[in-house]
Amino acid sequence: MSIILGIDPGSRVTGYGVIRQNGRHLQYLGSGCIRTSEKDLPGRLKQIYAGVTEIITQFQPDVFAIEQVFMAKNADSALKLGQARGAAIVSAVNHDLPVYEYAARLIKQAVVGTGGADKAQVQHMVQHMLKLPAKPQADAADALGVAICHANTNKTLIALAGQATSAKRGRYR
């Protein structure tokens, strides 16, 4: 049994989702968004770090999973996204959590069944898979998708290994 924290990073809105994996069963524990209010990027990064730290303290996850940087429409957006990811990852590493990264297409594949799924499809499937009474916010649904992707990837690796061992830890550990 493990608690997985999934993060969908963003410099303005960072989604988070927390699930408990017990064998094949996934249980929803919580989700939401860290909304930054600072105008300058360093202030927003500080808010992301503090928000992720608060979530880690509240839920005590065993694993931290985050979406990889995708190629944004412009370099400035990609850099800001990378910095937001960095703030979240530093919080995880400071709490001695193993860090795993997943590409957006792999996350969508794990949740919806196709890497080209849109946000509405991800929201619908996350609601269905976790038996939620309502659709989660888009960024929170994406973060729950990251956590679900890790849970499914971890289950597959355990099955392939033929024993109950964890997947290789991320490079940030």
From Swiss-Prot:
Cofactor or coenzyme needed: Mg(2+)
Binding site for Mg(2+) 1: D8, D139
Active site: D8, E67, D139
GO biological process, one term: DNA recombination
Cofactor descriptive note: Binds 2 Mg(2+) ion per subunit.
GO MF entries: crossover junction DNA endonuclease activity; DNA binding; magnesium ion binding
Keyword terms: Cytoplasm, DNA damage, DNA recombination, DNA repair, DNA-binding, Endonuclease, Hydrolase, Magnesium, Metal-binding, Nuclease
GO cellular component: cytoplasm; Holliday junction resolvase complex
Residues the entry annotates as binding Mg(2+) 2: E67
Catalytic reaction(s) noted: Endonucleolytic cleavage at a junction such as a reciprocal single-stranded crossover between two homologous DNA duplexes (Holliday junction)
Subunit: Homodimer which binds Holliday junction (HJ) DNA. The HJ becomes 2-fold symmetrical on binding to RuvC with unstacked arms; it has a different conformation from HJ DNA in complex with RuvA. In the full resolvosome a probable DNA-RuvA(4)-RuvB(12)-RuvC(2) complex forms which resolves the HJ.
Family: Belongs to the RuvC family.
HAMAP family: RuvC
Purpose of the protein: The RuvA-RuvB-RuvC complex processes Holliday junction (HJ) DNA during genetic recombination and DNA repair. Endonuclease that resolves HJ intermediates. Cleaves cruciform DNA by making single-stranded nicks across the HJ at symmetrical positions within the homologous arms, yielding a 5'-phosphate and a 3'-hydroxyl group; requires a central core of homology in the junction. The consensus cleavage sequence is 5'-(A/T)TT(C/G)-3'. Cleavage occurs on the 3'-side of the TT dinucleotide at the point of strand exchange.
NCBIfam families: ruvC
Protein name: Crossover junction endodeoxyribonuclease RuvC
Source species: Vibrio vulnificus (strain YJ016)
Chain's gene name: ruvC
